[in-house]
Amino acid sequence: MSAGGPCPAGAGGGPGGSSCPVGVSPGGVSMFRWLEVLEKEFDKAFVDVDLLLGEIDPDQADITYEGRQKMTSLSSCFAQLCHKAQTVSQINHKLEAQLVDLRSELTETQAEKVVLEKEVHEQLLQLHSTQLQLHAKTGQSVDSGAIKAKLSVHSVEDLERELEANKTEKVKEARLEAEVKLLRKENEALRRHIAVLQAEVYGARLAAKYLDKELAGRVQQIQLLGRDMKGPAHDKLWNQLEAEIHLHRHKTVIRACRGRNDLKRPMQAPPGHDQDSLKKSQGVGPIRKVLLLKEDHEGLGISITGGKEHGVPILISEIHPGQPADRCGGLHVGDAILAVNGVNLRDTKHKEAVTILSQQRGEIEFEVVYVAPEVDSDDENVEYEDESGHRYRLYLDELEGSGNSGASCKDSSGEMKMLQGYNKKAVRDAHENGDVGAAGESPLDDTAARAAHLHSLHQKKAY
């Protein structure tokens, strides 16, 4: 039994998987390593004590039980202590970084103040020298004392007050400018933090919805194992249930892809793919052939995700504006690429698909099929909106730094990692059964119609 110290505060479990704390100094890393060593020592001592309790005479089982209860409480306290220590450490290093920045800004401000004071002194000397030269040119023999004597005491005091007032006003302006800069930096940091939190919420909701569907499919498979059914009928129903799970995985990834796109440019379905026709085919459109013209110096202008190793087809996750894929107008986010120039991509892995797509030149023919995830969604209107109507997005536009060259390899770390941790068994079962298909929670007897279209489309092959 282990204390199982949790991840450092700020580590996320969103679509991008667990994220390490940003900006942790080397001291913070060593602190986490120290905690890890301490946790291992605690686990070792915990196991030793548990073994000692197991050697107590069975007649004294009450002592063993109470001892293990106390050990459980001790383990829980140690885990919470580790979590709090990690949180405090991260906050401490964040404050240290802010302190370094403030010290640097203070040093620069003090240096600027000294420079300005020297410049003012030099300007006054130059003004005094210029006045003396002016009087010398006009033939007047006047020294500095005579110039000062021309000013009345009242005028000197007024001049000093005016200079002091100007200085106060300029200090206020400089202070406001400095505060604005600090607030802008803080706002940018908070926006990035909110973007990460929104990504975690978005990914968690997608994963929870997918797991709910997959759990229903797995329960039906367990029920199928309890039936007295063998031979082709058993295999057919089993494959249909796998088809349910696979298509829902497909649709979940498409939702993640669409969540990354700009809300000002809503995703459009291909012509002829209205909601009524898509509902009849469970959100899966017909196979389309799209021609794309690409110059040698250009990329395709698309980003892809998925692959055989993830249990989903090669999906278009993003179309870059102004690139060949955008100009042709026939490709859409959510399209599954079945083939390109006659090369079958149904059974290819992600890296293989990237290589094949990057090698295409000139006139390229895509064989794609469109899948609409919202058709099968039971809460399509509010799935990613909160009570205020704000839609959860994966990333802010200014935080995205992806390139547009070729078939950009996003390696599904943004859209797929949230599924990899949950459905490795599902992917393994899918590869063994060699099947793809539809998603849903319908009873066993109702799954045939939902999976038939996908079976005919992909010849019962896993992507």
From Swiss-Prot:
- Gene Ontology CC, one term: Golgi membrane
Say if the entry is tagged with keyword Transport.
Answer: yes
| UniProt-listed SMART domains | PDZ (SM00228)
The domain comment in this protein's record states: The coiled-coil region probably mediates targeting to the Golgi, oligomerization and interaction with RHOQ. May also mediates association to membranes and interactions with GOLGA3 and STX6. The PDZ domain mediates interaction with ADRB1. Also mediates interactions with FZD5, FZD8, ASIC3, GRID2, CFTR, CLCN3.
- At the top level, the lineage of the source is Eukaryota
One record GO biological process? autophagy
What is known about what this protein does?
Plays a role in intracellular protein trafficking and degradation. May regulate CFTR chloride currents and acid-induced ASIC3 currents by modulating cell surface expression of both channels. May also regulate the intracellular trafficking of the ADR1B receptor. May play a role in autophagy. Together with MARCHF2 mediates the ubiquitination and lysosomal degradation of CFTR. Overexpression results in CFTR intracellular retention and degradation in the lysosomes.
Query: Where do the coiled-coil regions begin and end?
Result: 85-201
Q: How does it sit in the membrane?
A: Peripheral membrane protein
Q: Which Pfam families match?
A: PDZ
Phosphoserine: residues carrying this PTM: 402, 405
Q: Where in the cell is it found?
A: Cytoplasm; Golgi apparatus membrane; Golgi apparatus, trans-Golgi network membrane; Synapse
Please give the residue positions where the record annotates the modification N-acetylserine.
2
- Oligomeric form and interacting partners: Homooligomer. Interacts with FZD5. Interacts with FZD8. Interacts with GRID2 and BECN1. Interacts with CSPG5. Interacts with CLCN3. Interacts with STX6. Interacts with CFTR. Interacts with ASIC3. Interacts with GOLGA3. Interacts with NLGN1. Interacts with RHOQ. Interacts with MARCHF2; the interaction leads to CFTR ubiquitination and degradation. May interact with CACNG2. Interacts with CCDC62.
Please provide the record's keywords in A-Z order: Acetylation, Cell projection, Coiled coil, Cytoplasm, Golgi apparatus, Membrane, Phosphoprotein, Protein transport, Synapse, Transport
* GO molecular function, a single term: frizzled binding
Kindly provide the name given to this protein in its UniProt entry: Golgi-associated PDZ and coiled-coil motif-containing protein
Q: In which tissues is it expressed?
A: Ubiquitously expressed (at protein level). Expressed in dorsal root glanglion (DRG), spinal cord and brain. Isoform 1 is preferentially expressed in whole brain (at protein level) and cerebellum. Expressed in spermatocytes and spermatides but not in Sertoli cells and spermatogonia.
